[in-house]
Swiss-Prot record:
Species classification: Eukaryota, Metazoa, Chordata, Craniata, Vertebrata
Protein name: Alpha-neurotoxin NTX-2
Family classification: Belongs to the three-finger toxin family. Short-chain subfamily. Type I alpha-neurotoxin sub-subfamily.
Subcellular location: Secreted
Signal peptide: 1-21
Originating species: Naja sputatrix (Malayan spitting cobra)
Residue pairs linked by disulfide bridges in the UniProt entry: 24-45, 38-62, 64-75, 76-81
UniProt keyword terms in alphabetical order: Acetylcholine receptor inhibiting toxin, Disulfide bond, Ion channel impairing toxin, Neurotoxin, Postsynaptic neurotoxin, Secreted, Signal, Toxin
Cited PROSITE patterns: SNAKE_TOXIN
Function noted in UniProt: Binds to muscle nicotinic acetylcholine receptor (nAChR) and inhibit acetylcholine from binding to the receptor, thereby impairing neuromuscular transmission.
GO function terms (MF aspect): acetylcholine receptor inhibitor activity; ion channel regulator activity; toxin activity
Ranges that cross the membrane: none
């Protein structure tokens, strides 16, 4: 009986994927693509873009931060969706 309960617990953990971590791109502007695993149960990736004296800038990462006027932000919820 204990073996059956332990087996059911393991199957439940595997099926629910309790250890899932969202993966987001985190490269800046025109750098080569890189990714990072988000921490703290983060459920969003973002891509923030703006223009300044250096030209068109892009920032990517985990979360969905608030931005100032003139900065465009796109937030999404699937792995590597912010490229």
């Amino acid at each position: 009986m204990k073996t059956l309960l332990l087996t059911l617990l393991v199957v439940t953990i595997v099926c629910l994927d309790l250890g899932y971590t969202l993966e987001c791109h985190n490269q800046q502007s025109s750098q080569a693509p890189t990714t990072t695993g988000c921490s703290g149960g983060e459920t969003n990736c973002y891509k923030k873009s703006w223009r300044d004296h250096r030209g068109y800038r892009i920032e990517r990462g985990c979360g969905c931060p608030s931005v100032k006027k003139g900065i465009e932000i796109n937030c999404c919820t699937t792995d590597r969706c912010n490229n």
